[in-house]
């Protein structure tokens, strides 16, 4: 799914109105119907609803929503905010329609009026500005937003929380911003929804589809994408009846250190679960028994050193390499990693301590094989590129690092992002807070190795690995819960995640 900036969404609206064709007021009606369906499915009629309506099309959505909910039997109060003399044509039409519904109480509020209190029992709907405002909220309207935020009511924002900057960091926004519990956005997720710094404004968000013209969506060139099942399913390769283990590649995992052999175990098992024909784990010799016992399906290559990675094995037999989980940053390991980079042209997966070593030796980075994959968490990424002023700045640094070095950067988080050498960036839709547990990243590294070994392009491996990793985590959370979820639970659900992509049921939502 494409993530359109606000100016492109406006173009999509205009294109739809012109080419469907459909009137602006009818497109607004379509959006309000989707909102109404969500409210009726999630909010009981026993809860009265208070809608704050602005003077633009976001306000028009609010007036139309109030009318539809009143017709369903909800108790509706609307507060029409008179911060200007102008009202958009479609908003004016829905304002007049709402006025004709006797069951709706409409209160006009202007800059000189005392603000009425917000009853505690009401669910508040923010239909003030949505995504249409690009300047900070000040003055009279700031008082309205502040009053809503200071209440303890549930707040539902339409399209985007009012005052929220969708396409730039809100760390530079000195105005008031609605702090929503739920945000119902139209057709596409907004770019700003995907960053931790904005969670307190956006809350839980959902995309409501309002039928914007598919020709525009297909043709518009966009760099940022939001990964859904439909994006990933076509990438899966069908297995041949007469294939054998050699068909699906041989992955080399260089991992593990004294006290951290579990990282190597998790990654090796995940690599096999992700479909690699063979996985060899190159580990310090002290870990041999652990690996052979914990993952008997994997082969073991023992390092000359008992506790550290000190020398890479012959690389000629392998289709893909991953390095880093539990490795440590000993000087021996640093030297061995440098030689590894010099002695292969295979795209590699760099994780954990391999990234930390490169962070200490940045002059090595230009020699990393093109199309390699980096999988840092935010702190590891900071060691590579330095501090960022905000989440948007960090995303720009991530994209620039990928472009400059011709690599893929998977920045792990709630919406794990994949920055590609061509400038595109993919944000993940799967995963959950239960995956914030030790070893989760090692599982991802193993999955990436297993997928790469099968001959997938690194970009495909990144997309499939990240999406399937999160999906396996979602299945694990549904079985064990967030608190009890451990990394090996994610591994146990990799097969089920693959089945989701390879076996679409009739009538299933893609």
Model-identified regions with their sequence ranges:
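Small-residue (G/A/S/T)-rich helix-start motifs and N-terminal tracts that mark the onset
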Residues: 1-80, 88, 182, 193-347, ...
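N-terminal small/polar loop signature for handling phosphorylated ligands or for N-terminal nucleophile
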Residues: 66-149, 289-301, 311-313, 317
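Short beta-alpha junction loops
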Residues: 82-85, 161-162, 354
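Short, solvent-exposed loop/turn segments at secondary-structure boundaries
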Residues: 90, 136-138, 169-170, 385-389
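A structural motif corresponding to the C-terminal end of an alpha-helix
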Residues: 102-104, 150-153, 404-407
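Short acidic loop-to-helix transition motifs that present clustered carboxylates
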Residues: 111-114, 162-166, 191, 306-308, ...
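Internal gly/pro-rich beta-alpha loop/helix module
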Residues: 121-123, 128-222
């Amino acid at each position: 799914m494409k993530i359109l900036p606000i100016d492109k969404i406006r173009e999509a609206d205009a294109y739809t109105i012109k080419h469907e064709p459909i009137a602006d007021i009818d497109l607004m009606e379509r959006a309000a119907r989707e909102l109404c369906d969500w409210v009726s499915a999630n909010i009981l009629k026993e809860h009265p609803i208070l809608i704050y309506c602005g003077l633009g099309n976001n306000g028009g959505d609010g007036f139309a929503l109030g009318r539809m909910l009143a017709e369903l039997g909800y108790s509706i109060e609307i507060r029409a905010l008179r911060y200007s003399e102008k009202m958009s044509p479609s908003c004016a039409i829905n304002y007049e329609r709402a006025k004709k519904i006797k069951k709706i109480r409409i209160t006009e509020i202007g800059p000189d009026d005392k603000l009425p209190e917000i009853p505690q029992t009401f669910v508040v709907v923010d239909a003030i500005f949505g995504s249409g405002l690009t300047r900070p909220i000040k003055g009279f309207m700031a008082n309205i937003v502040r009053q809503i935020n200071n209440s303890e009511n549930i707040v539902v924002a339409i399209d985007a929380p009012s005052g929220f900057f969708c396409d730039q960091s809100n760390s530079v926004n000195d105005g008031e911003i609605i702090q929503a519990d739920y945000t119902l956005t139209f057709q596409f997720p907004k770019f700003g929804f995907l960053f931790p710094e904005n969670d307190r404004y956006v809350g839980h968000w959902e995309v409501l589809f309002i039928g914007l013209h598919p020709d525009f969506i297909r043709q518009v060139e966009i760099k940022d994408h939001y990964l859904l099942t439909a994006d990933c399913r076509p990438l899966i390769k069908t297995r041949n009846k007469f294939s054998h283990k050699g068909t699906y590649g041989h992955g080399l995992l260089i991992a593990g250190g004294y006290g951290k052999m579990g990282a190597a175990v998790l990654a090796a098992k995940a690599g096999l679960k992700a479909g690699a024909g063979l996985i060899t784990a190159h580990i310090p010799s002290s870990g041999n028994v652990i690996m052979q016992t914990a993952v008997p399906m994997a082969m073991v290559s023992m390092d000359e050193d008992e506790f550290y990675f000190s020398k890479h094995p012959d690389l000629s037999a392998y289709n893909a390499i991953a390095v880093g989980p539990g490795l440590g940053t000993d000087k021996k390991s640093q030297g061995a990693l440098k030689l590894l980079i010099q002695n292969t042209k295979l795209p590699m997966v760099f994780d954990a301590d391999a990234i930390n070593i490169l962070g200490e030796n940045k002059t090595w980075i230009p020699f990393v094989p093109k199309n390699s994959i980096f999988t840092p968490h935010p702190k590891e990424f900071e060691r590579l590129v330095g501090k960022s002023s905000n989440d948007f700045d960090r995303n720009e640094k991530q994209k620039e690092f990928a472009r400059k070095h011709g690599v893929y950067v998977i920045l792990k988080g709630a919406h794990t992002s994949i920055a590609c050498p061509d400038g595109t960036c993919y944000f993940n839709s799967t995963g959950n807070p239960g995956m914030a547990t030790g070893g989760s990243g090692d599982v991802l590294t193993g999955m990436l190795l297993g997928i790469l070994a099968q001959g997938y392009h690194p970009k495909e491996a990144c997309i499939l690995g990240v999406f399937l990793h999160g999906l396996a985590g979602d299945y694990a959370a549904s079985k064990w819960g967030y608190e009890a979820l451990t990394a090996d639970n994610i591994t146990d659900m990799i097969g089920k995640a693959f089945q989701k992509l390879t076996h679409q049921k009739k009538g299933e939502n893609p």
